[in-house]
């Protein structure tokens, strides 16, 4: 089968002929229709320090996808041939304390599809049936292929009550932009998103952000005054991993504010903890998606009218995969879809 593999321990990714994966008794075999390129895939492509420590070479990568079930393990129930599915990319152990308590998104033994095991940039993928999620008929393949990052946005945004609240999102990558759309859809008052990438800030405006602020040109506190805000942001969603962005968030949070952190800093990050203490802030770390409450909420949000389609900006056939990675690497894109049909 065709597959995109991290074939060498250097920058790049390669289109190869790989063996079709073998299925176990509790697995599904999925014929891939579309995949999306994640920021994680770009780290792997660029072969940065994290990738060098984490990714086995050679390995098929990728973890954002939609496809069709073409074979079912003999122990599997609840799926049939022809089901259209995406899937949770975090494979959990099932036996640690959190797994046994139903908090599988906090499994201490998580294995990542396309990170620690063979991924979805291929014509076929095998995953445990537990990890598959049936896609409703009224949700397109394009949208289903980005459910993984959309789930990060939904999990982060819905960590706290948003109705009537003022929300600050730091980092206008695709996940931050989708989070802005979610916040507006569920009833936040002002949703302000910050970045220095004007292309992505414009995408955020299209997706419903009240204000998309280029912090290299505008002062965040001036924007707050313009919006009539007198007490600070009620909810903060940190999506950038950039220390200066998090510092600005702590400066502008209201007393008693709540912060959800998804962005991963490049290293240790020092902050002024007195701001957290004296403001009485609550900080919550976010990793992945809740299984499977986040997935049901994703489908329901789209079915209730949330439109995240503007975040998909580029489409390529798999043979043109290099153009897709170039588009992602340029910073002048939203989500990039690769078609395997």
UniProtKB/Swiss-Prot annotation:
Matching InterPro entries: ADH-like_C, ADH-like_N, ADH_Zn_CS, GroES-like_sf, L-Threonine_3-DHase, NAD(P)-bd_dom_sf, PKS_ER, Zn_alcohol_dh
Active site: 40 (charge relay system), 43 (charge relay system)
Short name of any one Pfam family annotated for the protein: ADH_N
Cellular localisation: Cytoplasm
Annotated cofactor note: Binds 2 Zn(2+) ions per subunit.
Binding site for Zn(2+) 2: 93, 96, 99, 107
Reactions catalysed, as given in the entry: L-threonine + NAD(+) = (2S)-2-amino-3-oxobutanoate + NADH + H(+)
Coiled-coil regions listed in the entry: none
Keyword Acetylation in annotation: no
Reported cofactor(s): Zn(2+)
A cellular component term, taken from the record's GO annotations: cytoplasm
Functional pathway: Amino-acid degradation; L-threonine degradation via oxydo-reductase pathway; glycine from L-threonine: step 1/2
Binding site residues for NAD(+): 175, 195, 200, 262-264, 286-287
Single GO MF descriptor: zinc ion binding
Enzyme class, UniProt record, top EC level: oxidoreductase
SMART domains assigned to the protein according to its UniProt record, in alphabetical order: PKS_ER
Annotated keywords: Cytoplasm, Metal-binding, NAD, Oxidoreductase, Zinc
NCBIfam families membership: PRK05396.1, tdh
Assembly mode: Homotetramer.
PANTHER family: L-THREONINE 3-DEHYDROGENASE
Role according to the record: Catalyzes the NAD(+)-dependent oxidation of L-threonine to 2-amino-3-ketobutyrate.
Protein name (database record): L-threonine 3-dehydrogenase
Organism, as annotated: Shewanella putrefaciens (strain CN-32 / ATCC BAA-453)
